[in-house]
């Protein structure tokens, strides 16, 4: 989690949900610890005096983005199960083959930082404000109004690689598999829990 300067605003950064754009909008640099939720200071941020917010993303788009990001970071594969599997099993050419690799071991995929289901952050971070990545250009104004002195404007640009040497189009079967893996995310995404 990341406190927005000296305010009572705390950003719960779900990987691959425009988190770098959010912290940058408030003049902050992204830190690797922004994704953490188990440090003492993170537990302190769960207090009622803090206003916690997060950005939720369409689960299919997030999955493909996480795969692309994993491909771009293969040189940093040690200790990262998804990147190690990509290298060890030749899964760098097709997102569908990558997904099929985890058919019998979904937990191995879902414990990887960039593939952890969004519901984990939603349930454990207890946000009071949920923004949607697909509407972030307008939704961010909710947070900007709470800390106008720090808001520098949102620059929505994808930091993940747009061009990768792999097929990143999911088949219908793969889309169904993603929907099964992230069924709770889809319930939150499509249900009233996140608003419209």
PLM region descriptions:
Residues 1-196:
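Membrane-interface amphipathic segments in extracytoplasmic regions
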């Amino acid at each position: 989690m990341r406190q927005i300067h000296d305010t009572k605003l705390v950003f719960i950064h779900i990987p691959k949900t425009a988190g770098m754009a959010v912290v940058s909008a408030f003049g902050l640099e992204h830190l690797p610890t922004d994704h953490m939720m188990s440090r003492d200071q993170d537990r302190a941020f769960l207090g009622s005096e803090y206003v916690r917010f997060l950005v939720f993303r369409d689960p299919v788009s997030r999955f493909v983005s996480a795969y692309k990001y994993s491909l771009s970071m293969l040189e940093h594969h040690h200790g990262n199960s998804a990147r190690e599997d990509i290298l060890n099993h030749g899964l760098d050419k097709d997102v569908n083959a990558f997904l099929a690799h985890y058919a019998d071991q979904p937990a191995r995929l879902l414990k990887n930082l960039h593939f952890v289901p969004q519901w984990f952050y939603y349930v454990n971070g207890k946000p009071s404000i949920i923004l949607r990545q697909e509407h972030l250009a307008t939704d961010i104004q909710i947070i900007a109004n709470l800390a106008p002195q720090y808001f520098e404007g949102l620059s929505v640009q994808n930091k993940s690689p747009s061009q990768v040497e792999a097929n990143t189009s999911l088949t219908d079967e793969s889309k169904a598999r993603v929907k099964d893996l992230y069924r709770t995310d889809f319930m939150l995404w499509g249900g009233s829990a996140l608003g419209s």
